[in-house]
Amino acid sequence: MSTFKPLKTLTSRRQVLKAGLAALTLSGMSQAIAKDELLKTSNGHSKPKAKKSGGKRVVVLDPGHGGIDTGAIGRNGSKEKHVVLAIAKNVRSILRNHGIDARLTRSGDTFIPLYDRVEIAHKHGADLFMSIHADGFTNPKAAGASVFALSNRGASSAMAKYLSERENRADEVAGKKATDKDHLLQQVLFDLVQTDTIKNSLTLGSHILKKIKPVHKLHSRNTEQAAFVVLKSPSVPSVLVETSFITNPEEERLLGTAAFRQKIATAIAEGVISYFHWFDNQKAHSKKR
């Protein structure tokens, strides 16, 4: 099988199309996203897009796992899939109250393949994508919240590597193999778009962590990076938020309370709002130059 190498000399999407990449057969999500990004994104920059309805920004919230995939399970039987859905719904309500069009990848106990979650974000024209989790670890003492962005250079820590590998196996629970259907996107679009997208994802992560810190312990003070499949969007800034470790007895107890779920959801939503304020200020500043 031949290997595609990044076409670093091609700087515009029109050039990429003329190079014949559009004629290649890409399956499912890859084809739809590739066409969208090659034709619509300019100068290789990832940015919030103008919305059709009322100019609202769109944030797609992805409650991790669902259906046959329970996610991590706490000592007392709490299931990650239920906890994160409740948190995601809280985040959605808060963002909507602030004029942001927040949508869920799932609103019930259903299984959605990882790549389909990414595709949902693109179909909704998302400005941001956030996958919400409450994962587990072999050591029940592991505790605190973390935020992750995509890395195409390897994991930033052993924990990031462990969690990404664990999350990337989610499709296998339902008998689906999570193959890299976007291999060509990684090779070509990463050169054109992904660098800025990852930078914005890291910035989004820092805003969320800053808001979580006063209300809950942080497992990592900085946005970590790893090759999470669900974060592989070429142009939509994307993060994965580990709200807590459900395998930690105390954090499992907290996750079971409506008060804590609301508290962590508020912090996450405030982080998103803070990020948009930052982005608008950056944009206004650049126009003055």
From Swiss-Prot:
Q: Extract the signal peptide range.
A: 1-34
Q: Which domain of life is it from?
A: Bacteria
What is the reaction catalyzed?
A: Hydrolyzes the link between N-acetylmuramoyl residues and L-amino acid residues in certain cell-wall glycopeptides
List where Basic residues composition bias occurs: 46-55
Any Pfam family matching the protein: Amidase_3
Q: Which InterPro entries does the entry mention?
A: MurNAc-LAA_cat, N-acetylmuramoyl_amidase_3, TAT_signal
Where in the numbering of this chain does the MurNAc-LAA domain appear?
59-273
Q: Name one GO cellular component term.
A: outer membrane-bounded periplasmic space
Q: What terms describe the molecular function in GO for this protein?
A: N-acetylmuramoyl-L-alanine amidase activity; zinc ion binding
Name the Gene3D superfamilies on file: Zn-dependent exopeptidases
| UniProt-listed NCBIfam families | PRK10319.1
Q: Which PANTHER family match?
A: N-ACETYLMURAMOYL-L-ALANINE AMIDASE, N-ACETYLMURAMOYL-L-ALANINE AMIDASE AMIA
* Family stated for the protein in its record: Belongs to the N-acetylmuramoyl-L-alanine amidase 3 family.
Q: What protein am I looking at?
A: N-acetylmuramoyl-L-alanine amidase AmiA
Q: From which source organism is this entry?
A: Escherichia coli (strain K12)
Q: Gene symbol?
A: amiA
